[in-house]
Every structure is written in structure tokens, then in C-alpha cells.
């Protein structure tokens, strides 16, 4: 393999020389010269194939479909580390297709969960493009960075919240220019979950970094997402921390929601999935009464009241902290510690580890909102600095997603519409697609696994940004292949007529309005890295 790699390097370098181009060695030197006080280039290498695939530790939280791609040509891989302040250790990777095949684009790839590892970039190599990604620097918190009882240092939080993504982009562009001898013509960002928040942080804080952003099941209402899961924990656990519901009970409650709506939801959703996860209070009462008859154990004590609290907006002192969970998820409203991001670390630093969560109330939540969430959130409705440059955003929400509940995403889009001239004007630059049957990341929804991203979404974004064709729909396939389902831009819903033809039904708009104090977003000026 070593002989083959050397031969390939010589061959490629010879081809460049014949074409009057700078040699590959000189190109590598230019890449290394990008290094400065913030950036250390640790490896530049010609690759002939991808590394063997291991188990992805963040697969469950990667909010996009898996892509089986084959890397068939040589490419250059660049590993670099960023340290904008003492204690930062942001690992990054760029892949660069060979110059004769490069499409002139650079893609930023988002991460997932608490990150700490580098996402796979093979799909970009197969696309003959360039891409860059980062682990968001969270491993700098120490070997127990995933331990929720360990507070994260302030610098690590800054890197995770917004700084790592911006610096990754700045140096990724420099590396691409150094290799290709010219700047990229277009820059795009693709991310889901945490990656969706990364993309929206770029839109709001550094609007010149990208021309277009794919934000799949985004955690841009980051504080609200964690508050929602804290609320779910409170309602489904007793004072001793023990679960009040079995997994089977919660799954049966979700099944009851599907059955309850079967007579009113249109085809092909009826009896299979919830067409629209926004239930009125009367619908919540109705389906829970129906569920209690089918599942006698949830009629005990105050279980029905607790379940109603899960699905209804979370309101305290007249202020809405969360819109409520959407009924009908495949696994039921099961609490998962792994889905929480910054709140447990924050509470641990305030003397409330997991063992004391039964003592956490709105005083601690309000403290979290004041002290941490403004840099964590990426949910300012003012996207004008990005859209005035011609920037485009494709955003999705999943009606079966309980990790990043869909309600706050819909609320965010509505606030964007209010702040930017209405939905007609906003749809020229940003579109939201709410997907029935879509759970989070690698999660299994009732009819589909994963969420639409991959090549379909990338093509739609490029076509919108470069050719002016806005996405009229996206397509998802049911797992069993029985339905190829179009998804309309919000607030539309595709329904199937008796003859099998699809048509768009306009649905009501809006959800419960989250209070502004939960959504504060500090927009940091470029260059202000501390």
C-alpha cells in the first residue's frame, strides 16, 4: 500500500506538472502555511480510499439519513487543531477532492449531540467537492466530558456553542484556497440536531460564512430543548428519581394517539402515523381518555394528569417555557439522559447533580436561561443579514421527534415570519418542512428510520442558491416501501385522494408562543473569540 500511495502521489504530481500547475508537494506546503497562532495543521495526506468504518458513537443523534457512498478517486485529507484560547482543543478535518474534479464548493458538516468525534465526510468526496467538519472541542473538558455530573469550562462551552464552527469555516476556506489556488465559489452548511444549531448559529452570528444552510431537526432553540427534557423527567419520574411509567405503557399511549386520530387524519397517515402533531387541548383530553380505557394502569393515581402535562405547553407564572411534546412517537415519550446537552453540566456546576434533579425548579431553570442560554441558543428571528446576501435555509422538523421536539421549531419559524415580512416573503429565502413519521437521527419512527438529508437536501439547496429554484417539496420513503411520501413546505400537508393522487391541504399555522426569555440569543461579532 505504501508503494502504491507513493506511486499515486508521483503520478498525480506529474499530471499537474504537465498541465502547468504547481506540484502536489507545493500545494501541501501552501496548506501547512495556513497554520498560525490559532491553527495547527497536524496532517496533510493523499488518500486513496476511506478509513474502515467503525461504530459511530453518535449515530442515534445524527439527524440525517445514512448514505452508502463509494470513494473511487484520490483525495487530500487535512487534519488541523484550533486553540483560540488556553484550554481550547478543537479537532477539525477537511477533505479536498483533486483539483481537476472540484466543483468549486466547500461544505461545512455539522456534528451531533455533545460531539467529541469527527463526522464522516465520504459523501462529500464522492460528490467531487470539498468539506470541513469539527468535533466542537468538547473533549477538552476532560476524559469524562460525557459525564453529566462534570461541569464544562467556559472556554469549552464557547467552542461548543458557536466558536468552533465559525473558526472551522474560516480555516477550512483558507485550506481550500491554499490547495486549489483560488477561493471557493460557494459555501454551504449541512447539519442536523446539534449540527442544525451550528448552521443557524452561523446564519445569525457569522452571516458571511455560508451561502446556504441545511438545518435538519435543529437544536437551535437549545435551551428550550433541554428544558423540555427536564420537564419530561419531572412528569415521568417520582421524587425518588424512579420511573412512574413503564416503556410499554408509554408506547401504548402513543399507539392510542394514532388510533384516536385514525378517523380524522387523511390518507395515507390515518391508522399509521400522526399527520400533524399539534393537538388542541380537547384532542389531548380525548386521546388520553381513550388511552386510559385501553390501558387501565395509566388511570391510576395522577398518571393521566402527568401525561397531559407532557403534551400541553409548559407554563409557569404566565410564561411559556415549552410548547409540549407531540403525541404519537414510535417509542412513546421515554426520557433519555443522553439527549440532554448543556443543562445537566450547568446544574452540576450549581450543586445539582443527577441525584438531586428532584430538587430542581424554575429558579434553577431561570438561572440557566440567564447565565448560559444566550450563547447556546441560535434562535433570533432576525435572519436579515444572511438573507440580504442571498442566503437560503432549508429547515425540517419531525412530528415524531422527542429529542428535538417539533413545536419549538415551528414557533421559531413563525417568529422569523413575523420579523421578516410574513411567510410569503420569508419563503423566498427560508422554508420549513414538517415531516410525519420522522423521529430523531438514527431513531426509528413508525414508518421511517432517520430523516431526509443526504444528497436530496444538498441538491435542493444548491439548486435554490445557484439557480433560484426554491424547493417545492421533499420526498421520504416509508421503511416498508409502501409509500413514497412528498412533504410540503409548512403549513402545507400532502394528502392522498381516493385515486392515489397527492394534493396539498393548507393547515392552520402556529403553536404555543414560547416566552422571549427562553429564546435570548447573543449575536457575537466576527473576530470576538473570547
Q: What spans do the regions from the language model cover?
A:
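Short beta-strand/loop motif that positions the catalytic acidic residue
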Residues: 395-397
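Catalytic-loop region of hydrolases
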Residues: 20-103, 118, 261-275, 282-353, ...
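Short glycine-enriched nucleophile-adjacent loop
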Residues: 196-207
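Conserved alpha/beta-hydrolase "acid-adjacent" motif
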Residues: 403-407
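Alpha/beta-hydrolase fold nucleophile elbow
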Residues: 182-192
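Mobile cap/lid helix-loop segments that gate and shape the active-site cleft of serine hydrolases
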Residues: 341-381
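A catalytic-pocket lid/entrance helix-loop region that shapes and gates access to the active site
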Residues: 210-301, 306, 448-455, 459
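Cap/lid segment of the alpha/beta-hydrolase catalytic domain
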Residues: 103, 112-181, 227, 356-365, ...
Amino acid at each position: 500500500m505504501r508503494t502504491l500511495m507513493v506511486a499515486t502521489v508521483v503520478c498525480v504530481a506529474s499530471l499537474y506538472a504537465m498541465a502547468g500547475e504547481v506540484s502536489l508537494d507545493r500545494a501541501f506546503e501552501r496548506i501547512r502555511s495556513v497554520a498560525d497562532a490559532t491553527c495547527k495543521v497536524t496532517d496533510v495526506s493523499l488518500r486513496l480510499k476511506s478509513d474502515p468504518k467503525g461504530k459511530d458513537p453518535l449515530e442515534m443523534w445524527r439527524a440525517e439519513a445514512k448514505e452508502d457512498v463509494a470513494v473511487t478517486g484520490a483525495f487530500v485529507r487535512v487534519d488541523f487543531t484550533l486553540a483560540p484560547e488556553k484550554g481550547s482543543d478543537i479537532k477539525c478535518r477537511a477533505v479536498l477532492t483533486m483539483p481537476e474534479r472540484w466543483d468549486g464548493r466547500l461544505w461545512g458538516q455539522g456534528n451531533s449531540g455533545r460531539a467529541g468525534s469527527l463526522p464522516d465526510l465520504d459523501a462529500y468526496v464522492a460528490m467531487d467537492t470539498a468539506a470541513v467538519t469539527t468535533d466542537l472541542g468538547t473533549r477538552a473538558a476532560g476524559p469524562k466530558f460525557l459525564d453529566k455530573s462534570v461541569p464544562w469550562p467556559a472556554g469549552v462551552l464557547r467552542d461548543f456553542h458557536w466558536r468552533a464552527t465559525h473558526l472551522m469555516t474560516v480555516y477550512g476556506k483558507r485550506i481550500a484556497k491554499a490547495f486549489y489556488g483560488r477561493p471557493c465559489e460557494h459555501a454551504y452548511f449541512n447539519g442536523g440536531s446539534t449540527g442544525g444549531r451550528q448552521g443557524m448559529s452561523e446564519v445569525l452570528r457569522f452571516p458571511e460564512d455560508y451561502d446556504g444552510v441545511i438545518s435538519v431537526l435543529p437544536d437551535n432553540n437549545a435551551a428550550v430543548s433541554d428544558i423540555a427534557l427536564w420537564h419530561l423527567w419531572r412528569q415521568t419520574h417520582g421524587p425518588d428519581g424512579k420511573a412512574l411509567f413503564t416503556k410499554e405503557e408509554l408506547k401504548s399511549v402513543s399507539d392510542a394517539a394514532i388510533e384516536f386520530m385514525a378517523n380524522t387524519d387523511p390518507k395515507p397517515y390515518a391508522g399509521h402515523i400522526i399527520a400533524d402533531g399539534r393537538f388542541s387541548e380537547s384532542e389531548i383530553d380525548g386521546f388520553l381518555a381513550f388511552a386510559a380505557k385501553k390501558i387501565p394502569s395509566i388511570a391510576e393515581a395522577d398518571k393521566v394528569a402527568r401525561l397531559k402535562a407532557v403534551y400541553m405547553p409548559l407554563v409557569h407564572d404566565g410564561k411559556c417555557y415549552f410548547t409540549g411534546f407531540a403525541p404519537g412517537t414510535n417509542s412513546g415519550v421515554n426520557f433519555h439522559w443522553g439527549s440532554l446537552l448543556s443543562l445537566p453540566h450547568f446544574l452540576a456546576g450549581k450543586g445539582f447533580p443527577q441525584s438531586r434533579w428532584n430538587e430542581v425548579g424554575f429558579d434553577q431553570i431561570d438561572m440557566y436561561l440567564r447565565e448560559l442560554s444566550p450563547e447556546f441558543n441560535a434562535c433570533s428571528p432576525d435572519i436579515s443579514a444572511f438573507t440580504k446576501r442571498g442566503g437560503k435555509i432549508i429547515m425540517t422538523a419531525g412530528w415524531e421527534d422527542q429529542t428535538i421536539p417539533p413545536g419549538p421549531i415551528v414557533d421559531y419559524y413563525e417568529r422569523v415570519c413575523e420579523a421578516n415580512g410574513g411567510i410569503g416573503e420569508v419563503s423566498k429565502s427560508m422554508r420549513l418542512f414538517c415531516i410525519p413519521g420522522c423521529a430523531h437521527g438514527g431513531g426509528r419512527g413508525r414508518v421511517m428510520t432517520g430523516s431526509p438529508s443526504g444528497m436530496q437536501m444538498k441538491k435542493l439547496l444548491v439548486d435554490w442558491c445557484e439557480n433560484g429554484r426554491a424547493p417545492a417539496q421533499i420526498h421520504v420513503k416509508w421503511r416498508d416501501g409502501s409509500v413514497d411520501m412528498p412533504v410540503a413546505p409548512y403549513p402545507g400537508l400532502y394528502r392522498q385522494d381516493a385515486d392515489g393522487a397527492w394534493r396539498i391541504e393548507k393547515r392552520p399555522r402556529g403553536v404555543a408562543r414560547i416566552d422571549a426569555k427562553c429564546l435570548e440569543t447573543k449575536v457575537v461579532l466576527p473576530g470576538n473569540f473570547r
